Amino acid sequence: MKVLWPALVVTLLAGCRADVEPGPEVQLGKEWATWQASQPWEQALGRFWNYLRWVQTLSEQVQEELLSSQVTEELTALMDDTMKEVKACKSELEEQLGPVAEETKARVSKELQAAQARLGADMEEVRNRLAQYRGELQAMVGQSTEELRGRLNAHLRKLRKRLLRDAEDLQQRLAVYQAGIREGAERSVNTLREHLGPLAEQAATMHTLVSKPLQERAEAWAQRLRGRLEKAGFPVGDRLDEVREQVQEVRAKVEEQANQVRLQAEAFQGRLKSWFEPLVQDMQQKWAELVEKVQLALRAVPTSVPSEKQ
C-alpha cells in the first residue's frame, strides 16, 4: 500500500499538461498520439476525436457536408457511442466496489458522474458550435466565409483542448480507482491466507489427534476378538453375548470421541468467526481511507485550461 499509493499519485499528476505550447495544432496532435485507447470508451472517444480533426480541416468535402446535417448527425452518433461505453465502464467499476461501505461507494459514484458529465458537455458543445456554424454558413451563401472559418477553427481548437483535458481526467480517475480495487483485493487475499493458514494447520492436527486413538482402539479390539475366536475353535454362538458386549463398548467409545470432535469443531467455528469479523471491518476501513486519498489527489490536479496562443 505504501509503495503503490505514491506511484498512483505520480501517475495522476503526470497527466497535467505544461503551459508552454509550441503551437496549438502541433501540441494537440502530439498529446493525442499518447492517448492509451485500451478501454471501449477510450476507443469510442478516439473515433469522435478523429472525426472532429477531419471536420476542422474545413476541406471542400467538409464544407459541403456542413451545409447539410450530415456532420452533426455523425457527431451525435459518435457521441452517443462514447457516452454509452463510459456508462458501462462506470457501472462495472461500481459493481467491483461491492463490499465497501455505501458512503464510500456513493462518493466514488459522484466523482465519476461529475467527470462523465464534463466529458459529455464538451462533446455537446462541439456539436452545437458546428450546428451554429452551419446556420451562419447558409446565411452567407455567395459571400466570403474566410473570417467565419477562422473563428470556427479557433473555437474548435479550444474545444478540443478542453475535451482532451476532461477525457484524461476521467481516464485517470478510472485508472486510480481500478488500481485501488486490485490492490485492496490482493491485500485482502494475503491477509486471509495469513489468518487461515494457522487455523488450517490446527484443524489438521486436531483431526490426527482424534482419528489416531480411534484407529488404534479398533485394531486392538479386532485382534482381541480374533484371538478369542481362534481359541474357541470358531464356536461363535457360545461367545455371541461377549462379542455383543465388546461391540457395544467400542460403539460407546466411538460416540464419545465423536462428541468430543463435535465440541472441538464448534469451538473452531467460533474462533474462525472471531478472526473474520475484525478482518472485514478492517478491509472496509482501509478501502474508505484509500478512496479518500484518491479524491484528495484528484482535487490537487490543476483544472484550469492553459491560455491559447494566437
Swiss-Prot record:
Residues 271-283 are annotated as: Specificity for association with VLDL. Residues 259-310 are annotated as: Homooligomerization. Pfam families: Apolipoprotein. Residues 77-248 are annotated as: 8 X 22 AA approximate tandem repeats. It is found in: Secreted; Secreted, Extracellular space; Secreted, Extracellular space, Extracellular matrix; Extracellular vesicle. Residues 207-283 are annotated as: Lipid-binding and lipoprotein association. APOE exists as multiple glycosylated and sialylated glycoforms within cells and in plasma. The extent of glycosylation and sialylation are tissue and context specific. Keywords: Chylomicron, Endosome, Extracellular matrix, Glycoprotein, HDL, Heparin-binding, Lipid transport, Lipid-binding, Oxidation, Phosphoprotein, Repeat, Secreted, Signal, Transport, VLDL. SUPFAM superfamilies: Apolipoprotein A-I (SSF58113). Residues 155-165 are annotated as: LDL and other lipoprotein receptors binding. Belongs to the apolipoprotein A1/A4/E family. This is Apolipoprotein E. It comes from Dicerorhinus sumatrensis sumatrensis.
